[in-house]
């Protein structure tokens, strides 16, 4: 072999060694330019909002852009409402806010402050089943129609709304607002004193069973107020909410058994075929929901919790417990949330409320079927309400109204992705195929101009834009247009915007 040929062979061998040694680096660098299959996979569609938990979606986005998926993500919260407050009631407020559920604290202190029978423990359960007229309906009619002091809230300090239970229930029913009714033997002021806390003897249980039966029979059989959702007590594990000391789980289990039995008897006997729902355990930051799923699942069909703070922390934990049982597809309600600490005059707190509504309308372990913010009105002069005792609407009333407009009523949802940690967004459509884009900004200092890509849902459309911030209380601020599916929006600090893009046939 010639020397030149030997030299060429040697150089070829050396070059091959260099290439093989560098191959892992070349492969790594090439991968940075070519997206993997996982990175190009589209997001999931058609996920049931009360389905099992979803795997996390890893999708990148530019910080000041929002990209909306064209595939349905889930459905929004079906029922968004409020708890009552004793100082006021005006159906026009509920309709303006856009709520479709109202949480009422019923029970003995409200409608049986004195035993309706002259003999404790009578009529018995068997006597009532034999003849419901064994109950003193004259006293029930009086309490529900002509309450003490002219107010169905006679059990609360003044000022009180002046009106009776008939008016309250009839107006809610006429407005098609779903009533969630708490059934409790004692209230948060530990009344009535004649009712044991908790019931223990046969006569105690006769009294409680009769009260539950009489409440529902009066509302739905003697009258037709369509009350079909019942909460078993209110925070029974909290000393300030009735029982002293707080109930044990065993005591609550027995209480739930008698409560459910009375509810079921009314519906099966007098309202056959009518759907009804029983909620439990109405606790906050507790392991009771997990235990109830194992101990008394036969006595309730709707998981019921209270969450004060970020929705995700309480809701995700309870969904995990539900997924481990046969309860995975049953509804989860948050029948109290928001604040009882006088925080509804803060724009930043209003943004946290909007964010919770968005979380609750997200699929998987964050999903909330129904919710009732605490509270719509003040209790007496205690500033817990979105509306004060004089009728003035606090700042966060308007945050709630904006969020409800976007999310109320089991609407199809579409994932709306942004890379900006201050922004949270979701998109929904209504029955008329109008598209709603809701964006919140939790930064107290930084406003943002964002670019929105809605091309997967719409190409061209005109819109109406509402804004909530320190200068705007859910007011219309513009009419953005969509061109080739694109638009730009300005999001104020500690603010939110909602854009409704109108569907054109």
List each language-model region with its residue ranges.
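Carbohydrate-binding surface patches
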Residues: 420-459, 497-498
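Solvent-exposed beta-hairpin/edge-strand motifs
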Residues: 455-474
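Catalytic-core region of carbohydrate-active enzymes that cleave or remodel glycosidic bonds
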Residues: 302, 306-381, 388-406, 442-444, ...
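Substrate-binding cleft and catalytic face of glycoside hydrolase catalytic domains
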Residues: 97-300, 304-313
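C-terminal beta-strand-rich structural cap/linker in extracellular carbohydrate-active enzymes
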Residues: 480-505
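Mature N-terminal, pre-catalytic/accessory segment of carbohydrate-active enzymes
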Residues: 2-88
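Alpha-helical scaffolding within the catalytic cores
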Residues: 63-68, 87-90, 162-167, 212-214, ...
